A protein has these predicted regions:
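Membrane-cytosol interface segments of multi-pass membrane proteins
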Residues: 1-161, 286-349
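Membrane-interface junctions at the ends of membrane-embedded or membrane-associated helices
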Residues: 15-16, 79-86, 150-153, 192-205, ...
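Aromatic-anchored segments of alpha-helical transmembrane domains
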Residues: 31-38, 102-104, 159-173, 210-223, ...
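Juxtamembrane "helix-exit" motif on the non-cytosolic side of transmembrane helices
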Residues: 42-46, 111-116, 168-171, 218-225, ...
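Interfacial loop-to-helix transition and helix-capping segments at the boundaries
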Residues: 53-65, 123-137, 168-185, 199-202, ...
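Specific transmembrane alpha-helix
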Residues: 65-78, 135-147, 174-200, 232-252, ...
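Hydrophobic core of alpha-helical transmembrane segments in multi-pass integral membrane proteins
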Residues: 158-168, 207-221, 239-245, 296-312
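Alpha-helical transmembrane segments and terminal signal-anchor/GPI-anchor hydrophobic tails
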Residues: 197-259, 274, 281-282, 289-292
Length: 349
């Protein structure tokens, strides 16, 4: 049996159907990211985050970036099977390129008014993950590190990085956080290489109930709002509960928007923040009050902008160039086919 996530649903179904549950999970994680930034960016409108949203965002922390990283790890067997050269070109095209391009675009949006002297700290900060695009930078580093450790056993290496995360100072963005997330990445990779276990985990009601109990205990006893090894039980439990639910309903017509969001995750991720930021700045200039309404409008606008661009991407080379490197840098060395919805969805985060 091929050690890929495809074995979860079972043989006999097309490859696309076998990935539906993962697309749903990515969609859920992306919407959680959008809501988080719609709340945190209220500060640019001189407004406070509503307590209810603050609580929701805190509870959803393990369902945002950690879930996306875990899912990226699940796709590793398929990625590395392409060979080192195609693997590297694909990741640079689908992750490295949008990171650099949107770092520049975001810098152009954020920089006006700061003055030329601000460039001395702004440029290095942005290029080292000092913006919302840090996730893409970290993911690119994880893909590079995966080549180094690809011949080593996954779980022992993951354990080493969990120890490093525990030893690192708490809440350090470039120490504790990447070590913890890379451990999750390796854990997802290991699961993908054990399709029987993965199949059982996402199908078993008993496993889902046990995971829900662990998740509840984690929320009650641990700080789940931070990326660190102490959040590992709750993070894995939350991912399992969501995977169980997604697996059962993934092909529902009602979830088509979530699947679409998940398949085009890189588009929604890079687009949402600038849209929300600009709207918050405009709201501040207009003296708009009402944080709840502003969160709803800005999050809705960000998702709408992402949807429009995701729909346009397979039809427009110009739009496609906003998210994927030119064809000669792609994994196959050829431009993305115009009829491929969302381009190469399995290489996006």
């Amino acid at each position: 049996m091929s050690p890929t996530p495809g074995g979860v649903v079972g043989a006999g179904r097309p490859a696309q159907a076998r990935a539906d549950w993962m697309d749903v999970l990515r969609g859920v994680a992306l919407i959680a990211v959008v809501l988080f930034h719609a709340g945190t960016l209220l500060r640019f409108a001189d407004l406070q985050v509503p307590e209810g949203l603050r609580a929701v965002n805190g509870a959803a922390a393990p369902l945002r970036i950690p879930l996306l990283v875990l899912l990226s790890g699940l796709l590793m067997p398929r990625s590395v099977s392409k060979g080192v050269r195609r693997y590297a070109r694909g990741k640079l095209a689908a992750v490295g390129y949008p990171f650099l391009l949107w770092t520049v675009l975001y810098g152009l949006v954020y920089w006006p008014g700061l003055g030329v002297e601000a460039l001395a700290w702004l440029v290095p900060s942005l290029l080292t993950g000092g913006s919302y695009l840090w996730y893409l930078l970290f993911l690119l580093v994880f893909y590079a590190a995966a080549l180094v450790v690809r011949h080593l056993p996954r779980l022992p290496v993951a354990a080493v990085f969990l120890v490093l995360a525990e030893l690192a100072p708490d809440a350090t963005k470039h120490l504790e956080r990447p070590a913890f997330l890379f451990a999750l990445f390796l854990g997802g990779w290991w699961l993908a290489e054990h399709p029987g276990l993965l199949r059982t985990a996402v199908r078993s009601p008993l496993a889902a109930v046990a995971a829900a109990a662990v998740l509840g205990a984690s929320y009650a006893l641990l700080d789940m709002s931070r990326y660190g090894p102490r959040a590992l039980p709750g993070t894995l439990a939350g991912a399992l509960v969501l995977a169980f639910c997604a697996h059962r309903v993934a092909r529902s017509g009602l979830l088509r928007p979530l699947r679409f969001t998940g398949r085009n995750s890189v588009v929604f991720y890079v687009v949402h923040f600038p849209v929300i930021y600009v709207l918050m700045r405009c709201a501040d200039l207009a003296g708009v009050e009402g944080p709840v309404l502003l969160v709803v409008v800005s999050a809705g606008a960000a998702l709408a902008a992402g949807a429009v661009l995701a729909l346009a991407r397979p039809r427009s080379g110009l739009v496609r160039g906003l998210f994927t490197a030119p064809g000669r840098w792609s994994a196959s060395g050829a431009p993305v086919a115009a009829g491929a919805v969302g381009g190469p969805p399995r290489t996006s985060p």
